[in-house]
Swiss-Prot record:
Result when mutating residue 145 to Q: Increases Km for substrate 6-fold. Increases Km for NAD 3-fold. Reduces catalytic activity about 10-fold
UniProt keyword NAD present: yes
Encoding gene, per UniProt annotation: hasB
Binding site for substrate: 142-145, 204, 249-253, 257, 319-320, 402
Name of protein: UDP-glucose 6-dehydrogenase
Amino acid sequence: MKIAVAGSGYVGLSLGVLLSLQNEVTIVDILPSKVDKINNGLSPIQDEYIEYYLKSKQLSIKATLDSKAAYKEAELVIIATPTNYNSRINYFDTQHVETVIKEVLSVNSHATLIIKSTIPIGFITEMRQKFQTDRIIFSPEFLRESKALYDNLYPSRIIVSCEENDSPKVKADAEKFALLLKSAAKKNNVPVLIMGASEAEAVKLFANTYLALRVAYFNELDTYAESRKLNSHMIIQGISYDDRIGMHYNNPSFGYGGYCLPKDTKQLLANYNNIPQTLIEAIVSSNNVRKSYIAKQIINVLKEQESPVKVVGVYRLIMKSNSDNFRESAIKDVIDILKSKDIKIIIYEPMLNKLESEDQSVLVNDLENFKKQANIIVTNRYDNELQDVKNKVYSRDIFGRD
């Protein structure tokens, strides 16, 4: 089967690699550098499994800048373009998705379009009405950055949307796509759910909001424990051994961040509109309170320093260990709060060559020099290369994992 994938981020590329084991896949992107890397067997993103599969597996995959040619020949078109949250309108920016839909429909009269981008509840219905076609369906992704292909190989569940009154072809394509994902997976007995588009859209947003809820819950627990000088580690262990709660997703942090949780929680809150709720709004608020609290704690530690020059060293901007993503990283908001107090910031981030021009922080990518300059080293996730300056480190990373 010929499949086109719009977007070579961690969602699009992981799906492209997965499906190219048994199908002919063309990845479409607007960046020549990404296209060149993929065509040379290199991954443009950090993902151990994607890197290995591109290098070592027999894949039928290519990348192109020629979107129309790719879409024209495809039987299925997977759309995995960004949908960033627009704080001005309090809604996802879906213009890239809509642009691809319009382009595909203009050159291809038979392909079914499968949206993998995270979208607002009701978006598929809106697009079907706008473009007067039922050939647009949704399949939510449940992937972790840097582990996207692994999560496609070992999925927790597969969800594809389909409506009762859809044409036989669209129904067949929805089932076919679910089967493609299931047959490519290494995990046995993966649950497959076919449901309405709005229900599938809701699953994605509510699932991520629940994960944000867990992060916020354990962060508030940690705030209480630190404020009362209690052992946060022991409290969390004591709670988490309850099977109903579980010893997972319970490690305190500076706040949830990354590409998905911040925008998905805000979008779900926007979708509620006039529907009664308090919890969803509280999750978003809790995350902001946590970041403010962390900044305050750092300032308090600085005040105890005898040095006349106060320098905060930020160790890594990445949100998670082994990630290459800084988007919506909680530490960036903490930095902004500290800078508003005229505190000098130096940053160690080896994945950056320079900071944005308006950033008043200083990039120090010589680790030993960074350690010497900083009065206090702040890190969301602890790394063993800080072991020799452990007495300088402020982190709420209790379990040494994400």
